[in-house]
A protein has these predicted regions:
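Phosphate-binding and hydrolysis-coupling loops of NTP-dependent motor/remodeling domains
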Residues: 61-90, 103, 109-127, 337-413
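A generic structural signal for short, non-catalytic loop/turn and secondary-structure boundary residues
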Residues: 156, 261, 330, 361, ...
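P-loop NTPase catalytic phosphate-binding loop
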Residues: 1-34, 81, 133-243, 266-267, ...
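Generic recognition of flexible, low-complexity loop/linker segments
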Residues: 253-258, 299-300
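Short basic/glycine-enriched coil/helix segment immediately N-terminal to the Walker B
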Residues: 257-266
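Intrinsic-disorder detector for long, low-complexity, phosphorylation-rich regulatory segments
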Residues: 247-250
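Basic- and hydrophobic-enriched, low-structure N-terminal and domain-boundary segments
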Residues: 1-160
Length: 413
């Protein structure tokens, strides 16, 4: 009797085991078929792109049409991305290889994340999953200056930020968020706001109350004075560094000012430079103040990196009316937000690369280029400021971070 029961149990166990193995096998086969269908779909979509746009040449040979030359597209799928490589062989399709962003994006139904170009090919990288949009609260939890989940940079690497965008582009909101992020690393802040607007009243006055020094500068003469003082501070820092080589040289490398314990960055934010120019040019004295200010701004852009002084300039349009070409080339980070991305001239003035199919963006979205980090302009969504955010509490927290860093050296709020 015991033998029969044991046999029955073993038999039932075997049946159950075979059942689950069969289910697993069918699921695996189904997954493989779906994966193959997906890959075939990519291949088909790329072939359709080539044929429908006639990116090929053909000849009739022995009454049959044969392909003699075509744009070569290769692709590779990774866990997170689809990479499409447009090959460059020096033929008639060579220049076309770098202008396929919009077509490939439509063919794959994915947003273009990044484009890189070499002598032999242009690589288009399409993330398979949408990048998580950060909130203002998220950005105070990072040591880097952060724009999105995958886009950020360390202070000074590279230095200086040029931010452009029309009205209702989200430019001022991003400036406010960047100010909070700079406070988060202990930076001293100077806000140069010729419009005497939101940046002054919502952020500047709050910082003056909490930090205990002058933050807001509005008139052309105040702005010129702030830039003059920044250049003076830069030169003082350089002199201190020169007088103390043992402190500022380590392992054959010259340290920046803020690399040394007890030293902190200085950040100059100039919002709406055209408004500064317009107001300054109403008087002779104002014109002189403006010329001095622009000279000092140029000095800071060229020389201040080692002194840990950073400049952020906000504009509606990065035209040479305010920012000459030689100045624009010294901004390591360039951001263009909102509907301005539909203006090719604005894109050309902001970014070094012109081989991008820029799309028209909404509030808080646009393109970014970072020297040494993101070589080609990339679509981004800036940190989201919700209606429920307690603005006062948020900047209190940013100021608390500022004082927490400085308290390590015996300073106090």
């Amino acid at each position: 009797m015991t033998t029969i029961l044991s046999f029955r149990e073993n038999f039932l166990s075997s049946i159950v085991g075979i059942f689950f193995i069969s289910i697993f096998w069918f699921i695996f086969r189904f997954w493989k078929k779906c994966q193959q269908a997906y890959l075939n779909g990519i291949n088909y979509n790329l072939q359709y792109l080539l044929v429908s746009n006639k990116y090929y040449e053909s000849q009739v040979i022995n009454s049959r049409e044969e392909i003699t030359n075509y744009l070569v597209l290769k692709y590779r799928e990774t866990e997170k991305n689809i990479e499409v490589h447009a090959m460059k062989y020096g033929d008639k399709y060579n220049d076309l290889a770098s202008k396929l962003g919009s077509l490939l994006s439509s063919a794959l139904s994915l947003e273009l994340g990044e484009m890189t170009e070499t002598i032999k090919q242009v690589t288009y990288i399409f993330p398979k999953f949408a990048e998580k949009r950060l909130t203002w609260e998220d950005t105070l939890g990072t040591a880097n200056l952060t724009i999105s989940e995958k886009v950020g940079w360390q202070f000074g690497s590279p230095p200086h930020v040029l931010l452009a965008g029309s009205t209702k582009s989200g430019k001022t909101v991003l400036l406010e968020n960047l100010v909070a992020q700079y406070l988060n690393i202990g930076a001293e802040i100077k806000l140069l706001d010729p419009k005497n607007g939101e940046l002054s009243w919502l952020v500047g006055k709050k910082l003056e109350d909490r930090l205990g020094y002058k933050v807001v500068y509005n008139s052309p003469f105040q702005i010129a004075g702030a830039l003059r003082e920044a250049v003076r501070e830069m030169n003082i820092r350089f002199q201190v560094m020169a007088d103390n080589p043992d402190t500022y040289i380590s392992k054959g490398k010259v340290l920046s000012w803020a690399d040394v314990e007890g030293n902190y960055p200085l950040v100059i934010v100039l919002d709406e430079g055209i408004a500064f120019k317009t107001e300054a040019e109403t008087t002779k004295e104002g014109k002189q103040a403006y010329q001095e200010a622009m000279s000092n701004l140029g000095s800071l852009l060229v020389k201040s990196r080692q002194a840990s002084i950073e400049v952020i300039v906000g504009l509606q349009r990065a035209s040479s009316d305010f920012i000459p070409t030689y100045m624009r080339q010294n901004f390591g980070v360039a951001l263009l937000l909102g509907s301005t991305t539909s203006d090719l001239d604005s894109c050309r003035m902001m970014f070094s690369s012109q081989d991008i199919d820029y799309k028209t963006c909404d509030i808080g979205t646009g393109y970014i280029q970072i020297d040494g980090v993101i070589p080609q302009p990339r679509y981004i969504e800036t940190p989201f400021k919700s209606d429920e955010l307690d603005f006062e509490e948020y900047f209190d927290k940013a100021c608390d971070c500022y004082w927490s860093i400085r308290n390590n050296d015996g300073l106090s709020d």
